[in-house]
């Protein structure tokens, strides 16, 4: 028999996870989950963040949606082991932030990395012929040194992205821009230090964050249920075909996280990153 009545979500708290490096796959999964939260009219959302950050635009889009959603329902962010760089950025879309005292956070800044293999290519006798429409079309090419004027162009790009980051943190935490710049130099700090700097509101566990979200929504913290909105299958599950034994083996060997990181590195090469390395 099919039960004819739908379970109400108005007395439940939605929960989503943002884990690992933030890239396009993360953005798609999180935005899909946030759409579900909005459509099902949950009164509150708990966002569990355990991420070193990632790509700029993907972080910005998650932040924007969280900020929009926070105008309709109560949204609480809970920092796990690490919530750094882009992980901090997306949390700025949440009016209420809780971290563990030992959480690694901060790393507010931008990094852009390129590799120069010119000498190696010379040793193996490999060279490239490049035809380009402008002098900077092959900027950050791996077969030659970066020119001083190219470095200036990239530094301007980094500085602009950094300014966006600082402004968002200042607005999200109600701090002066100059105050944020005092600690937004790429350094990392603990959750305890983040509390002292005004980057988070409280210290506590994810369970504490759940109870906080319930209270904000006017629900009984001891009775309210938590609905975790699942994300699509990650790469390793697609490769194992969903086989639980293969999945467990991959997890035990550390292949799951390694594949995630390889996928991220391949998809973000040459991009500015809000990432703690």
Swiss-Prot record:
Pfam families found in the cross-reference section: Peptidase_S49 (PF01343)
Q: Which UniProt keywords apply?
A: Hydrolase, Protease, Serine protease
InterPro entries for this protein:
ClpP/crotonase-like_dom_sf, Pept_S49_SppA, Peptidase_S49, S49_SppA_C
Record-linked CDD domains: S49_Sppa_N_C (cd07023)
Among its keywords, does the record have Phosphoprotein?
Answer: no
Q: Which GO terms describe its biological process?
A: proteolysis
Q: Where is the active site?
A: 85 (nucleophile), 137 (proton donor/acceptor)
Task: Report what the protein is called.
Answer: Putative protease slr0021
**Which organism is the protein's source?**
Synechocystis sp. (strain ATCC 27184 / PCC 6803 / Kazusa)
């Amino acid at each position: 028999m099919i039960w004819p009545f739908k379970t109400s979500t108005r007395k439940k708290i939605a929960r989503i996870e943002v884990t690992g490096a933030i890239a396009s796959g993360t953005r798609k999964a999180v935005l899909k989950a946030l759409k579900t939260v909005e459509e099902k009219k949950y009164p509150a959302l708990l966002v569990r963040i355990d991420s070193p950050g990632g790509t700029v635009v993907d972080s910005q889009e998650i932040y924007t949606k969280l900020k929009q959603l926070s105008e309709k329902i109560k949204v609480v962010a809970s920092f796990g082991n690490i919530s750094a760089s882009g992980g901090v950025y997306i949390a700025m879309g949440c009016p209420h932030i809780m971290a563990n005292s030992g959480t690694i956070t901060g790393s507010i800044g931008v990094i852009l990395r390129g590799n120069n293999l010119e000498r190696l290519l010379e040793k193996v006798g490999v060279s490239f012929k490049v035809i380009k429409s402008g002098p900077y079309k092959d900027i950050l090419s791996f077969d030659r040194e970066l020119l001083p004027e190219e470095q200036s162009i990239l530094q301007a790009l980094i500085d602009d992205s950094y300014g966006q980051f600082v402004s968002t943190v200042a607005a999200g935490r109600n701090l002066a821009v100059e105050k944020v710049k005092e600690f937004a130099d790429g350094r990392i700090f603990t959750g305890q230090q983040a509390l002292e700097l005004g980057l988070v509101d409280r210290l506590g566990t994810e369970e504490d964050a759940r109870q906080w979200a319930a209270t904000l929504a006017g629900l009984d913290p001891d009775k309210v249920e938590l609905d975790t909105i699942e994300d699509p299958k990650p790469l390793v599950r697609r490769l194992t075909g969903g086989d639980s034994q293969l999945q467990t083996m991959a997890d035990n060997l550390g292949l799951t996280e390694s594949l995630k990181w390889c996928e991220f590195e391949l998809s973000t090469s040459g991009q500015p990153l809000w990432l703690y390395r």
